[in-house]
């Protein structure tokens, strides 16, 4: 078992990682007898894990309730947010309620935002069940819902009280969802840790075969990096923006093609290739470095090409709404080597256009 702390002074919290955590109530020991707890999950995750979590809560003497929501990125919306608010209000839950997000990134973001807003903020715990949410979205306090005009445009920075990661959840995860999570894992190697990138290149098969030791190491390393970055820059005014490698292109893909048609990690993978190609055209990385990035994402069974139906104008329409745009200037996160990245604000549109076009056929 691994334990990592996100250091944010009085708002610091633990991340616990290991196999079989759902069998031990010790990881929820901050909850007390009589405590009202609402577990919010979706219709896919509920049959797999809801009873286990409810049993742990009952063993602690908590008064536990369950809310099941529809499954899918399209439900990360204000309509579903209102559904959560109505459930909490109709149940007369007070400010001492604890909300648990049990699910993937959609549930984590939606429930976290709901916790931030309900009566101006109630405590919540993240229990991520997908690889993507375990290595990225459950850590760091970013919470949000989508708007038809942009992803994660309505949200708040709101930290959980703890994150509990049971790697056994990955045994029930479809391979497509697992691959989407691997995209975010690879991202950490590209932007922050060249040795980790090399390790991933050598252990990709072990990860896909769900080797417990490899999974625990990879998840823990990602969480360590995320915790280090968040401790330095909680509100994304500096270094934290680097965690968005591939996301500016990726969010454009998701918004244009419809939320849920591409998984978030799939869009990030294609976006990472476009960002790497942009960096290469800018002289920031060489052909060998680009090839390494392209190769590992391709081997991970992820999309690595520009969607056929999307034009340059489609991309720019959405990218200019990106949260990193300042004073009308598009800022892109680009790799400057394997293991480092930077935010670049002056990339000519013709370079972006060429990168998008090159990535239609590159191999």
Curated annotation (Swiss-Prot):
The keyword Amino-acid biosynthesis applies. Binds 1 divalent metal cation per subunit. Can use either Co(2+) or Zn(2+). It is found in: Cytoplasm. GO terms for molecular function: 3-dehydroquinate synthase activity; metal ion binding; nucleotide binding. Pathway: Metabolic intermediate biosynthesis; chorismate biosynthesis; chorismate from D-erythrose 4-phosphate and phosphoenolpyruvate: step 2/7. Zn(2+) binds at residues 184, 247, 264. Keywords: Amino-acid biosynthesis, Aromatic amino acid biosynthesis, Cobalt, Cytoplasm, Lyase, Metal-binding, NAD, Nucleotide-binding, Zinc. Its cofactor is NAD(+); Co(2+); Zn(2+). GO terms for biological process: amino acid biosynthetic process; aromatic amino acid family biosynthetic process; chorismate biosynthetic process. It comes from the Bacteria. InterPro entries: Dehydroquinate_synthase, DHQ_synth_AroB, DHQ_synth_fam, DHQS/DOIS_N, DHQS_C. It is an enzyme of class 4 (lyase). The keyword Transferase does not apply. NAD(+) binds at residues 71-76, 105-109, 129-130, 142, 151, 169-172. Gene3D superfamilies: 3.40.50.1970, Dehydroquinate synthase-like - alpha domain. It catalyses: 7-phospho-2-dehydro-3-deoxy-D-arabino-heptonate = 3-dehydroquinate + phosphate. GO terms for cellular component: cytoplasm. NCBIfam families: aroB. Belongs to the sugar phosphate cyclases superfamily. Dehydroquinate synthase family. Catalyzes the conversion of 3-deoxy-D-arabino-heptulosonate 7-phosphate (DAHP) to dehydroquinate (DHQ). This is 3-dehydroquinate synthase. It comes from Vibrio vulnificus (strain CMCP6).
């Amino acid at each position: 078992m691994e334990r990592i702390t996100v250091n944010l002074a009085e708002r610091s919290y633990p991340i616990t990682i290991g196999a079989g955590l759902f069998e031990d109530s010790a990881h929820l020991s901050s909850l007390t007898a009589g405590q009202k707890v609402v577990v919010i999950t979706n219709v896919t995750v509920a049959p797999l894990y809801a009873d286990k979590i409810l049993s742990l809560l009952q063993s602690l003497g908590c008064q536990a309730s369950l809310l099941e929501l529809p499954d899918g990125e399209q439900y990360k919306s204000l309509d579903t947010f209102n559904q959560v608010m109505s459930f909490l209000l109709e149940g007369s839950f007070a400010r001492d309620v604890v909300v648990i997000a049990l699910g993937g990134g959609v549930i984590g973001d939606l429930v976290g935002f709901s916790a931030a807003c309900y009566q101006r903020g109630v405590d919540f715990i993240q229990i991520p069940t997908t690889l993507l949410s375990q290595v990225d979205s459950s850590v760091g306090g970013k919470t949000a819902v989508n708007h038809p005009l942009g992803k994660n445009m309505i949200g708040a920075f709101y930290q959980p009280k703890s994150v509990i990661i049971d790697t056994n959840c990955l045994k029930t995860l479809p391979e497509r969802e697992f691959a989407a999570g691997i995209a975010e894992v690879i991202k950490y190697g590209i932007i922050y840790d060249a040795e980790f990138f090399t390790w991933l290149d050598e252990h990709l098969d072990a990860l896909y075969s769900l080797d417990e030791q490899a999974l625990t190491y990879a998840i823990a390393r990602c969480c360590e990096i995320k915790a280090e970055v968040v401790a330095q820059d909680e509100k994304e005014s500096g270094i934290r923006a680097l965690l968005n490698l591939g996301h500016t292109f990726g969010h454009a893909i998701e918004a244009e093609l419809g939320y849920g048609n591409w998984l978030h990690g799939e869009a990030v993978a294609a976006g990472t290739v476009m960002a790497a190609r942009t960096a290469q055209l800018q002289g920031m990385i060489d052909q060998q470095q680009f090839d390494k990035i392209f190769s590992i994402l391709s081997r991970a069974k992820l999309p690595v090409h520009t969607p056929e139906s999307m034009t340059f104008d489609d991309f720019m329409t959405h990218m200019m709404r990106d949260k990193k745009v300042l004073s009308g200037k598009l800022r892109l996160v680009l790799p400057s080597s394997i293991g480092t990245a930077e935010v670049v604000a002056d990339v000519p549109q013709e370079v972006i256009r060429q990168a998008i076009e090159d990535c239609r056929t590159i191999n």
